[in-house]
UniProtKB/Swiss-Prot annotation:
<dbReference type="GO" id="GO:0090729">
    <property type="term" value="F:toxin activity"/>
</dbReference>
<feature type="modified residue" description="Proline amide">
    <location>
        <position position="82"/>
    </location>
</feature>
<keyword id="KW-0800">Toxin</keyword>
<keyword id="KW-0964">Secreted</keyword>
<keyword id="KW-0165">Cleavage on pair of basic residues</keyword>
<dbReference type="GO" id="GO:0005576">
    <property type="term" value="C:extracellular region"/>
</dbReference>
<keyword id="KW-0027">Amidation</keyword>
<keyword id="KW-0166">Nematocyst</keyword>
<protein>
    <recommendedName>
        <fullName>U-actitoxin-Aeq6b</fullName>
    </recommendedName>
</protein>
<feature type="propeptide">
    <location>
        <begin position="21"/>
        <end position="36"/>
    </location>
</feature>
<feature type="signal peptide">
    <location>
        <begin position="1"/>
        <end position="20"/>
    </location>
</feature>
<dbReference type="GO" id="GO:0042151">
    <property type="term" value="C:nematocyst"/>
</dbReference>
<comment type="function">
    <text>Toxin.</text>
</comment>
<keyword id="KW-0732">Signal</keyword>
<keyword id="KW-1015">Disulfide bond</keyword>
Length: 83
């Protein structure tokens, strides 16, 4: 009987951790971690110029996007940003 009570308490604690823990809420804002993994992958290959650079601040699967030269296309940097 005591094992059953311990098991029930353990299950409730684990469920509470899963459902109430802020780290598992799926939330997190970009202010928490500026290099958080985002999926701005739609900008990969986008046309970029000096005047119009859609790559700035975009991250695709942990890789920061940038415009290698003026009048080119957005590509991913090879350095991985953990997030």
């Amino acid at each position: 009987m005591i094992y059953k009570a311990v098991f029930v308490c353990l299950v409730l604690v684990l469920l509470g951790d899963v459902f109430c823990s802020p780290r598992n809420s799926g939330g997190g804002t970009l202010n928490d971690n500026p290099f958080e993994k985002r999926t701005d992958c739609r900008f990969v290959g986008a046309k970029c110029t000096k005047a119009n650079n859609p790559c700035v601040g975009k991250v695709c699967n942990g890789y920061q996007l940038y415009c290698p030269v003026d009048d080119d296309h957005c590509i991913m940097k090879l350095t991985f940003i953990p997030g």
